[in-house]
Amino acid sequence: MKKVFILTGEPSGDKLASKVISKLKSSNPDIEFLSVGGEHLKALGIKTLYDLKEVTYLGFTRVLLNIFKIKKKINETVDRIIEFNPDILFSVDSPDFTLRVAERVKKLEPNIKTIHYVAPQVWIWRSGRVKKIKNFIDHILLLF
């Protein structure tokens, strides 16, 4: 049985992921899923490790005030993904959270395929990110 871990970091990513995963589930009912997701993924019957509110912080000040909680959740998420041992890590949007997790997972378990949906805007912000991302993301899916 194939296993997919779905990693989102905010409600909009949860919604985008649910659209893709809904199609995947209907065409491949034998896939086992686990996620860091929200209401949309839960509505598909997909178990989530914890509520998205535990990692969704908007604004520089809120992130700064919660930086230790965020780091703890990144570590916890990496550990749980490794424990689940998925064939694919499907991360969606929220690059400051999801790409940090994906990078660490890929370093620990290079055989896990990584797919990121909603490419970060590297051409506007942090142009050096492309060189780094290609080391741990196998495929990037774009929104059109």
Short names for language-model regions:
Residues 3-144:
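Active-site and donor-binding regions of nucleotide-sugar-utilizing enzymes
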